[in-house]
Regions:
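Active-site gating loops and adjacent loop-to-helix segments of metal-dependent hydrolytic enzymes
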Residues: 52-84, 164, 209-227, 245-250, ...
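Divalent metal-coordination and catalytic microenvironments
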Residues: 13, 35, 46, 99, ...
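His/Asp/Glu-enriched, well-ordered alpha-helical/loop segment
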Residues: 215-226, 270-352
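N-terminal metal-binding scaffold of metallo-dependent hydrolase/deaminase domains
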Residues: 1-26, 355
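Alpha-helical scaffold segments that flank or form the walls of functional sites
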Residues: 55-106, 112-129, 152-159
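Histidine-centered catalytic micro-motifs
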Residues: 41-52, 107, 194-203
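Histidine/acidic residue-rich metal-binding segments in metalloenzymes
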Residues: 116-130, 146-227, 231-254, 264-281, ...
Length: 358
């Protein structure tokens, strides 16, 4: 990716002309891009804005080694943190600085937090609505069926403004995948919202749940409105099973979200692309009670994804970038995303001649 120097004319917040445009009309404001690489605004398709400690004094990691331990540690500590609006806003500012113009954030909903996290993130987003678009997912971080009252709160969160309903390891954590998916897809059907389910379960258990999600998506006519986040099982299933799962994902336009995880096999981006499966990228939790890592720079995360995938060629590096741009836009259903006339003029300039050179 990278081409000849071109002029771009923006009118009323949208790209009007690309290439050979020359100077704008009377009153136009000219900005010299200095030959840098122009991209559409970056899309962070998997974040946890409510969890961040961004802007606070350094806190050493105290979470346990497994999912349950991490959840318990966070629930005990978060009540002593500054308001969500303050922390989420500080992290959004960092993301904006790095060229992120759209964020999908999962936000914890449970009997302790209630809808406070959702309200806090929505408020932080509203204060920055001219700079970034934030889509909130109601997320049952502490489990849904194992935490009585959470399902009702999830429904209320979507009614209060969440664009999507989430889920968490229907089998591995909630221990009842059928009921878990009944609740999640029931909320989606009731409110007409999107679905984005965290799925860490590996092996046959994870593969079976992905196929169950595909079946629910098909049955409810939700093609193009469902995402499976992490989907670790996809990276390790046998070839025949992979082909069947990938075909179902592609048919229903179900996206997979990755965060370039460090302790598990990365999603096979090339194989998924060749099968027609969309993959998007996020930064997950940034400097929070789960992990000390992250800084809001999605391009850095895309480079990490390329490195974890063993990519070296320009085409492969561009594939990693696609997860942070067009892949995210496809997952979130952003209309007109890109650099074509008529596209929203949410643009980023990078000091490079090509993506690989970045």
């Amino acid at each position: 990716m990278g081409g000849p120097l071109s002029d771009v004319v923006v009118d009323d917040g949208r790209i009007a002309v690309v290439g050979g445009a020359g100077p704008g009309g009377e009153g136009a404001i000219e900005f010299d891009g200095g030959g840098e690489l122009l991209l559409p605004g970056l899309v962070d398709a998997h974040a946890h804005l409510d969890k961040t400690l961004w802007g606070l004094p350094w806190r050493s990691h105290t979470g346990g080694p497994d999912l349950a331990g991490l959840i318990a540690n966070e629930r005990a500590a978060r009540r002593h943190l500054p308001p969500v609006t303050e922390r989420a806003g500080a992290l959004l500012d960092a993301c904006i600085t790095h060229g992120v113009t759209t964020v999908r954030s999962h936000v914890d909903v449970d009997p302790d937090a209630g809808l406070g996290g959702v309200e806090g993130v929505l408020a932080a987003a509203e204060a920055r609505r001219d700079q970034v678009t934030v889509e909130v997912v109601a997320f049952p971080q502490s489990g849904m069926l194992v935490e009585p009252g959470t399902a009702e709160l999830m429904n209320a969160a979507v009614a209060a403004g969440c664009a999507a309903v989430g889920g968490l390891d229907p089998a591995g954590f909630d221990r009842d995948p059928v009921r878990h998916l009944d609740v999640v897809f029931g909320i989606a059907e009731r409110h007409g919202c999107k679905v984005d389910i965290h799925l860490h379960d590996r092996g046959e258990l994870g593969a079976w749940q992905i196929e169950a999600i595909i079946a629910r998506t098909r049955a409810l006519g939700l093609a193009g409105r469902v995402t499976v986040s992490h989907a670790f099982a996809v990276a390790t299933v046998p070839d025949e099973r992979f082909a069947r799962i990938a075909a179902g994902l592609a048919e229903q336009r179900i996206s997979l979200a990755t965060v370039a995880p460090g302790r598990t096999e990365p999603l096979p981006l090339r194989r998924l692309r060749d099968a027609g499966v969309n993959v998007c990228l996020g930064q997950d939790g940034i400097r929070d009670l789960w992990s000390p890592y992250g800084n809001g720079d999605l391009m850095e995360r895309a480079a990490l994804l390329a490195w974890r995938s063993g990519f070296r060629g320009d085409d492969d590096i561009e594939l990693a970038l696609d997860t942070a741009t067009f892949g995210g836009a496809r997952a979130l259903g952003i209309d007109g995303y890109g650099l074509d006339p008529g596209s929203p003029a949410d643009l980023v300039l990078l000091p490079a001649a090509t993506v690989a050179g970045r």
